[in-house]
């Protein structure tokens, strides 16, 4: 990433953790520093990616879409996003704020779906070729609370319809990944919005200070 002039900041977490709100806050903080930004989401963010998203998230494909197919669709969408959107933005000095990235696949497919992490890592190496975020914020929320918050948004999609045990496995895997990768910043999202935003602001302001 050192050859690229922009920065990639990723927001991670379970459903209901407040990722969208966090993305908006980060954009606001960066704009105050006159930093040009774009936002992305996964899966999606490109024409092809949005088509793949509609397949992955569609409840009609419950018990139909094979876990392996889901994994490959996610990486297909991610490749398109990196090559069509993220890298071009970074190369012209824009900062990219992403709602989900690679960590989600490790947590959801590796943890939630119980897929072999070695297979996922091999696929990641092939598809991403070492491409990594400059900063990852993981919003940590209790799965039950997260689903209550997510339900308030409306009808559940295919992923959100999974069992609470599924989300507990994801939550546990996120914690393992954070311990294995100390550069990931974990923020307690069980707290009030004001407290969460204050923590995010502190992390982002320190990151800006060291990268401008």
Swiss-Prot record:
Enzyme nomenclature, EC number: 2.7.4.9
GO cellular component: cytosol
Official protein name in the record: Thymidylate kinase
Keyword field: ATP-binding, Kinase, Nucleotide biosynthesis, Nucleotide-binding, Transferase
Enzyme class: transferase
Protein family (similarity comment): Belongs to the thymidylate kinase family.
UniProt-annotated binding residues for ATP: 13-20
A Pfam family this chain is assigned to: Thymidylate_kin
SUPFAM superfamilies, sorted: P-loop containing nucleoside triphosphate hydrolases
Known role: Phosphorylation of dTMP to form dTDP in both de novo and salvage pathways of dTTP synthesis.
A biological process term (GO) from this entry: dTTP biosynthetic process
InterPro entries: P-loop_NTPase, Thymidylate_kin-like_dom, Thymidylate_kinase
Domain of life: Bacteria
This protein's encoding gene: tmk
Catalytic activity: dTMP + ATP = dTDP + ADP
Gene Ontology molecular-function annotations: ATP binding; dTMP kinase activity
């Amino acid at each position: 990433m050192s050859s690229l002039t922009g920065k990639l900041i990723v927001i991670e977490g379970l459903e209901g953790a407040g990722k969208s709100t966090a993305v908006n806050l980060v954009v606001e903080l960066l704009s105050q520093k006159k930093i040009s930004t774009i936002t992305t989401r996964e899966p999606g963010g490109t024409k092809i990616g949005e088509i793949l998203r509609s397949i992955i998230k569609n409840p009609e494909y419950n018990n139909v879409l094979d876990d392996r197919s889901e994994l490959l669709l996610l990486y297909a969408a991610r490749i398109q996003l990196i090559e069509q959107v993220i890298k071009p933005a970074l190369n012209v000095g824009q900062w990219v704020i992403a709602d989900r990235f690679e960590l989600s696949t490790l947590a959801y497919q590796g943890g939630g779906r119980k897929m072999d992490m070695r297979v996922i890592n091999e696929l990641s190496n092939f598809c991403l070729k070492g491409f990594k975020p400059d900063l990852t914020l993981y919003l940590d929320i209790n799965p039950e609370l997260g689903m209550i918050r997510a339900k308030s948004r409306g009808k559940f999609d295919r992923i959100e319809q999974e069992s609470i045990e599924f989300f507990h496995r994801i939550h546990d895997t996120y914690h393992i990944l954070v311990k294995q990768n100390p550069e990931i910043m974990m923020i307690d999202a069980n707290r009030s919005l004001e407290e969460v935003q204050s923590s995010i602001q502190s992390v982002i302001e320190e990151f800006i200070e060291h990268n401008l």
